[in-house]
Swiss-Prot record:
It is found in: Plastid, Chloroplast thylakoid membrane. The keyword Chloroplast applies. HAMAP family: PSII_PsbZ. It comes from the Eukaryota. This is Photosystem II reaction center protein Z. May control the interaction of photosystem II (PSII) cores with the light-harvesting antenna, regulates electron flow through the 2 photosystem reaction centers. PSII is a light-driven water plastoquinone oxidoreductase, using light energy to abstract electrons from H(2)O, generating a proton gradient subsequently used for ATP formation. Signal peptide: none annotated. Belongs to the PsbZ family. PSII is composed of 1 copy each of membrane proteins PsbA, PsbB, PsbC, PsbD, PsbE, PsbF, PsbH, PsbI, PsbJ, PsbK, PsbL, PsbM, PsbT, PsbY, PsbZ, Psb30/Ycf12, at least 3 peripheral proteins of the oxygen-evolving complex and a large number of cofactors. It forms dimeric complexes. It comes from Phalaenopsis aphrodite subsp. formosana. Pfam families: Ycf9. Its main location: plastid.
């Protein structure tokens, strides 16, 4: 169970870093928002799901 928690935390951190870099780049590009809107929303949904997964796994471990 601890390994699953650690992998979920790592995935959350990696997703956060990817979104931290990619979202400003998408907004700064000329037509990036209209063509990459679905990717940004998918990444945000993944991030929210990982937050809940980490919270659930944390409650099971401690």
């Amino acid at each position: 169970m601890t390994i699953a928690f650690q992998l979920a935390v790592f995935a959350l951190i990696a997703t956060s870093l990817i979104l931290l870099i990619s979202v400003p780049v998408v907004f700064a590009s000329s037509d990036g928002w209209s063509s990459n809107k679905n990717i940004v929303f998918s990444g945000t949904s993944l991030w929210i799901g990982l937050v809940f997964l980490v919270a659930i796994l944390n409650s099971l471990i401690s």
